[in-house]
């Protein structure tokens, strides 16, 4: 814990890491349909496992989130590219850590972490939707000015800003 300085997770020993990484890679690249796991759940498991294994001295969280994004993009979840789940995790670091600790302390019941991650994704999707709605409103407001011959979208937006703040 970065606030209290207490150790909240002890990763596997260095002798276990290589095998665990090999198993994680096999899991991430397994394309069989025999035991279907929804891609969002599987991406979350990959995220959790790399963070659990902690194979690097630094950057395990960033790498785990990168693998999460990679897997979803690989599976066709293109909107993931525009999500900022890292921002959500940063804003709720305590909840992220609790989900991880609960999963580890409750006989490795990863459902805590999956639940947290699904909520983080929902918040991120909601933020993206709100941003897109704001951009659409800006564009719509600028269209009044883009109707003027020779004025492009960006110029129309700037003219609208001036019109909204006349001083």
Regions found by a protein language model. Give the residues of each.
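FIC/Doc superfamily catalytic core
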Residues: 1-167
């Amino acid at each position: 814990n970065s606030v209290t300085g207490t150790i909240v997770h002890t990763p596997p020993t260095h002798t276990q890491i290589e095998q665990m990484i090999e198993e994680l890679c096999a899991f991430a690249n397994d394309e069989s349909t025999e035991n279907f796991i929804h891609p969002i759940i599987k991406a979350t498991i990959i995220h959790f496992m790399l963070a659990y294994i902690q194979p690097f001295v630094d950057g395990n969280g960033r790498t785990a989130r990168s693998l999460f994004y990679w897997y979803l993009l690989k599976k066709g979840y293109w909107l993931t590219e525009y999500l900022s789940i890292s921002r959500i995790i940063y804003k709720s670091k305590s909840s992220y850590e609790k989900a991880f600790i609960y999963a580890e302390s409750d006989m490795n019941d990863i459902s805590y972490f999956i639940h947290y991650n699904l909520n983080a994704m929902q918040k991120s999707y909601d933020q993206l939707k709100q941003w897109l709605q704001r951009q659409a409103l800006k564009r719509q407001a600028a269209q009044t000015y883009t109707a003027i011959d020779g004025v492009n979208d960006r110029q129309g937006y700037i003219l609208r800003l001036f019109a909204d703040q006349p001083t």
